[in-house]
């Protein structure tokens, strides 16, 4: 195996011609993933970077740092030019640290972007400006009624049409869970995880949640025989979904360590499974291209301690 090398060019990053053509093409595909890493300089945000670096096959990472001054009370006045300079200096320090952290990994530093203003709007503007495959963020994971209330990561994920990788804690990046329901969105999540992440030597788990049919209908409208038939069809469908995921993974010689079919409320069962199996990364699709408000993905993001990769 040759040493991975690349050089900066005006059109992006291109691997050096130091390997055979097949490997060069593979490396170029590997390096072509374009990621936007959003950081406020917090440990939480760098946990996301460190975890992601353990999963990725390689990516060009742009870093955006927004110094958000909008939290200041209206009665507090600042000298515009001086405050802007202070913002820029703080952002430069954070971006410099981010570049050094990226260079310690297999990731490639793209460009540093500094903004002074409202964090969510600034990040959304940058996402609209460039074509990114994944947006990478940390989440502070507030508790109780504060959970995701006013969260930058929540607002960004809820308003973008690209995939996102959200992290709260640094972890071993070893166990990955595909939470799937067999829909096109879930199938896309499996394909993109294989495409963007290095799953070799990882422990792969697959979970399908069947909703309890007795909760889907008014009490007294179903007899026990009909309920049993519905449950039997659910099991057959779940078996098919797992076989399809297994078949897709086997194309890349990726074995499943454990699969499970459980019954209950999808978000709750996914959260429970991730906790019980000490999952490091949950991969999910979402039925809605942008908004995830009220979705299973949103609920899992709120509660789980694992990283979450939401594919759109």
Label every model-predicted segment:
Residues 1-2, 25-31, 81-85, 100-135, ...:
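Structural beta-alpha unit
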Residues 81-93, 226-240:
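A short acidic, glycine-rich active-site loop
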Residues 151-169:
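Short, structured interface segments
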Residues 21-23, 136-139, 163-169, 310-312:
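Short beta-strand elements of ligand-binding domains
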Residues 6-25:
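Acidic, proline/serine/threonine- and glycine-rich low-complexity intrinsically disordered segments
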Residues 1-12, 134-155, 173, 281-303:
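Glycine-rich, Arg-bearing micro-motifs that act as flexible, cationic patches
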Residues 65-67, 139, 208, 285-287, ...:
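Short secondary-structure boundary segments
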Residues 27-81, 175-228, 247-254, 303:
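Small/aliphatic-rich secondary-structure junction motif
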